[in-house]
Amino acid sequence: MRRRLTALFFVAAVSAAGAAAVAGARSDKAPAVARIPAIPVAHVSARTDRCPIPARFRGAFVAAANDTNLPLALLTAVAQVESRFEPTATSSAGAHGLLQVMPTTAAELNLSADDPKTNVLAGARYLKRLLDRFGSTDLALAAYNAGPTAVAKRGGAPNSETLTYVGNVNEIWRLLHGCS
């Protein structure tokens, strides 16, 4: 119990720090949101299984990580938050699959959002494009969630939902340190 409380405290501190970094992308301004509540990630734990990708999708994630030179742990964290590894997940906005890729984004990349393998590759390539554009993992994750136009216009995460999203991906990514 004590170990779990310590882990939750650490996750809360990391989430708040990550959210503050995303909110205050420019150091001359105070963060838009000084503090957000951490959302415990009960479905991912710090255990010996450092890379909890379902076996049937592991090859797609490894290939996408190699293709984009993104950390496998980061792609795993995005998939956990986006779909909890449910390949048929569809958002209210129309995003599909493991990495919740919009069909228009997949089409721009000449890939399918519906097939798990190409969905993971499309999501990874899109995240890499955002990372190259914004130069920051936190801003790239915010743009992945809220759209690059909203992040560019705001100079950071445009709303508390996006701050929470970035914090959740970051806390899972940290828990998955060593995932390979």
What is each stretch, according to the model?
Residues 1-48, 59:
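An acidic, Gly/Ser/Thr/Pro-rich helix-cap/linker signature
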Residues 30-180:
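Catalytic glycan-binding domains that act on GlcNAc-containing polysaccharides
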